[in-house]
Amino acid sequence: MTQATSIQIHATCVAIDGAGILLRGPSGAGKSDLALRLVDAGAALVADDRVDLLRRGACLVASAPAPLRGLVEARGVGILRLPFLDAAELHLVVDLVARDEVERLPGPEAEAMLGVALPRLRLHGFDASAPAKLALALRHGVAIPAASGRSAA
């Protein structure tokens, strides 16, 4: 049986210095809000609400579906058109959770999508420090559990 090489998911994606960050969570978790704060701090929008993921070798590449390119929801303001990147290689998956679900000192976690393992963090999307935490996580590297490796078959 052949494994899929592409999927579309409900998420948001931004890139810091070209490194893609996939923001996941239920509606209202703060995906678009956090993306706007990251863009305001210098990140680039890749996709909001729906993200196309494509496996390219041992990497996952994120992009926006054509009708949504450059669009982001600013709750209370409306749909905004912003500059965007056509695509970004994913380096980090972030699950946005309730504040009481965020561990103070989490161990390494990974998420496998389309057979590619990526480091995963759980953050509260509305914390003021969330953009800084993500920038620092990329800069200093987030570990993938040793058993996961970069590519999961």
Language model features by range: what are they?
Residues 12-14, 52:
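Short beta-strand scaffold segments in enzyme catalytic cores
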Residues 1-8:
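N-terminal pre-Walker A segment at the start of P-loop NTPase domains
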